[in-house]
């Protein structure tokens, strides 16, 4: 990873510590997880990682508090629940309303979080993130999720006057593990569908 100059997402104190010890450039590290500890957030901020993905209003307050204690500004993205049902089965779908990851667009939580980040002295809004699941065949779910996130970005810009510097669209392209699985969609096909 380091030799190739790739970025890495981490989701625990152990993963973050390992990435840093392995020499991954902190500007290429993201911190995910819907139950981040103070220790994880503190290490992320002290190391100067690229961004922390916010999953709840509690995390908005938690990250603001820790950043204020350290005298730094935390780079954050808001993870959205787009309502998309995608993925090979319900256990790996990550964007519908009953999932523990992200803030709901449907209930207004996501908008509330972005507004709170805008008003926070120690948070720097870096954009919006969505991850719709894994083992996704076809392009439709990716395109629909992108439309939903872009529409929300326009609302954030229009109603809050806040630029949305980045949109991070996640989801795992399906893999044919068995002969019965459909032919996988290539990342190129997904990119083409998103470009139209």
Give, region by region, the residue ranges found by the protein language model:
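Conserved, mostly hydrophobic/aromatic
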Residues: 1, 12, 44, 63, ...
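Acidic (Asp/Glu)-rich catalytic clusters
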Residues: 1-3, 19-26, 45-46, 67-71, ...
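N-terminal active-site wall of soluble small-molecule enzyme domains
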Residues: 1-49, 88
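Structural preference for beta-strand elements that scaffold enzyme active sites
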Residues: 7-8, 26-30, 51, 73-79, ...
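Structured alpha-helical segments in the cores of large, soluble enzyme domains
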Residues: 19, 82, 106-125, 149-164, ...
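Glycine-rich tight-turn/loop motif centered on a GG-T
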Residues: 46-51, 90-105, 138-143, 178-188
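Conserved anion-binding
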Residues: 56-124
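C-terminal active-site-proximal or functional interface alpha/beta core segments in diverse enzymes
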Residues: 134-196
